[in-house]
Amino acid sequence: SAWVNEGILHESEARTNQMVYSGDLTGPSGWTGQATAGTVTAGSPFGTYQTLSPSASGGNLGPAQRYQIGKSITSGATYVGWSLVKYSAGSGWFVVNMYDTSKQSEQAFFDLQNGVVGSKDTLIIDHGMIDYGDGWWLCWASSNAASTSGGASYEMPNADGVQSCSAADVILIAGTQFEQGATPSSYIPTGSVAATRAAETLTVPAANLPYDSTNMSIQMDGKMTYADSGIASEVEMYRWILNGTNYINSTVQAYSSKTGEPVFSQRDSATALDSVVGSGNTYSPDTNVPFNFAVRHGSTFINAANEGTLLTANTTPTALPNLSSTDLNFGFDFMGTIGQFRMWDED
């Protein structure tokens, strides 16, 4: 498929890939299981890949597994496991199994041949497929830890929801990841030890901002990834804050019926909080959710439009906060790509 410039990949959360030798399932340590992994070969979106196939046909998935377990995890936290895979031969089914010593197996099934999400065990919170082009799929599953030891197993059943396998099945596998979080982040390659990607920040210095005490406009678009954990601010698109009573920001809420609801706010120390709110489920929790909005912040109004829908203006503000000497952070609490961020000192 043709390359498309999606913008800047920005991930405000630090993540650690606990899978060692994440791109080599024959790695000298870490990997266990009877499935047969081939030689590491150049040629995938992550640079290299291997073949993976069951070592024998059977009525259980023992011959069709490669796994790493015994990882230190936090009970009650959410973890996501994933792999970038491609169909090669046979049935084309693939499983991400979120292993936890208190719950044993938690399987999510994927049809690589047809690019279709299959069934999942009850304790899997969510699972999905992200299209990387040319038949490559990032297959992921999330679950809550119930112990302090766990990991992930990558398996090859010969149908949806079954525990049998066929030695004739072959897939290509390019990378694996097991990380704390509700959704998959970008690939963190590892060698003999786990690797961490630091949290990222995007800051515009105050000197470079077109601050105006009367009116300003902001436009932003891109794709975001988030899960519904039931909090008021799942995503914070931008944050321009002097203190708790002087700020401008934009969030996506995800609690009760407000899941996916965009909120555009401003507050001056002399006045109450003023906001304009979009519809619930405007942005449903998922991976790579497109967004596009524009907002007008004024001394006597705040208004916005998102996804082509003009929201009702709020005309109760009496002043804009004085942020003339304050840096602005965009993508403050954000996982995804930012296509554009534009700001100007006009209504």
Language-model features: locations:
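Extracellular and organelle-lumenal recognition/adhesion modules and their flexible linkers in secreted
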Residues: 1-296, 301-302, 306-310, 322-326, ...
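Flexible glycine/proline-rich, aromatic-decorated loop/lid segments
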Residues: 311, 315
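A short acidic/small-residue loop/turn micro-motif
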Residues: 318-320
